[in-house]
Amino acid sequence: DIKRMNELDVLVVNGIGHDEFIFDILNATDRKKDIKVIYANKNVSLMPIAGSIRNEKVMNPHTFISITASVQQVYNIAKELGELDPANKEFYLKNARDYAKKLRKLKTDALNEVKNLGNIDIRVATLHGGYDYLLSEFGIDVKAVIEPSHGAQPSAADLEKVIKIIKDQKIDIIFGEKNFNNKFVDTIHKETGVEVRSLSHMTNGAYEADGFEKFIKMDLDEVVKAIKDAAAKKGKK
């Protein structure tokens, strides 16, 4: 990682405490003063992690699992690159505009799928606080988060508390993480009977130029399907 870092001119980070480890690598390089760091979340509106079972007030770093915040990030990166490389400023901005247009269409298409369902109260819990920004695109607030923090195991008391919240709040859907086997979600499903759906965290796998579009569309499609199914159960079609 240090060798690869030494070959960079620019480093783009998410920030907000999500990728602090990268600065240890940066500080270990010979060229740390020469590498420009771009903070993708500069001026992006942040949300606190909703539904924390321990009532912790922490800003949510998962802005990249969304459309609205990701578009802001794209423009931030393009602007910063244009300042570093003025000769190609218009090239970066055009790419940003074209990409933002693609992302906005994905959001529009998803919202059009559920717009005729009317004002329905879809109640959601999540495995961790990774999906607040994505769900907010649909006007959905997260009522409960199972893990105290991403990857942290909830205690028996935490599980008891979240099961009570899910029952009291009449939660319709639990969103877990795709390709992540979590026994706590299974336990909660057995205790509450609430359906579990899976979303991508988009932090692994091979790099592909259109990878973000593919994964975010999969997530949008999964949320749309969950909303439709919940609406059908509530008698709205």
Q: Whereabouts are the PLM-identified features?
A:
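Extracytoplasmic metal-acquisition and chelation regions
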Residues: 1-237
